[in-house]
Amino acid sequence: MIVSGLAKGIDARAHLNADKTIGVLGCGINVIYPKENAYLYERMKKSGLILSEYPMHVKPLAYHFPWRNRLIAALSDNLVVIEATYKSGTMITVNECLELSVPIYCVPTAFQNVKYQGCNYLINNGANILVDINDVDDI
């Protein structure tokens, strides 16, 4: 089961490649955000689950996303971090998972890659290392 935020990039790919998936929104349930994920939103309406704690028509605001990440953490048995900068929303989810004792798995990367420095930081501080995509099924 994938639980993610229906965001661009890795979130969208995770939702697309999973059999079972939950998308947690940082806006009203009928607001598609980001717009480029409209196809994914429509697909998940039919074969997944879309959740929001916000009323209908509420637009996405920056302060909604940390709250959304709290729900993602609460619904997760494990957290897999593919990429994260030090100050990314992913790190907010990591902190929520730590509060809930949700195990964290990270993909290590080269030191100079800024987009992934958060992963190396988390591994250095006790996160589990994930080096083979096939291991995801065993988590």
Question: Where in the sequence are the language-model features?
Answer:
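Glycine-biased, small-residue-rich flexible motifs in mid-sequence functional cores and linkers
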Residues: 1-139
